[in-house]
Amino acid sequence: MDHRLLEIVACPVCNGKLYFNKENLELVCKVDNLAYPVRDGIPVLLENEARPLSIDEKHA
């Protein structure tokens, strides 16, 4: 994931900062506890495509 892209994208729910999870290829919003998929290098920033973070992921 290009770090320049991470500087300009935001969570579509709260407009907060997103963090890239390399292991799962997801952009994570720690405020809303949601993970958005990255498919073929393209972030899918749709609320209905996001998955809720597990309890373990929230505290990582």
Swiss-Prot record:
It comes from the Bacteria. It holds the Pfam family Trm112p. GO terms for cellular component: cytosol. HAMAP family: UPF0434 (MF_01187). Belongs to the UPF0434 family. This is UPF0434 protein YPO1399/y2773.1/YP_1194.
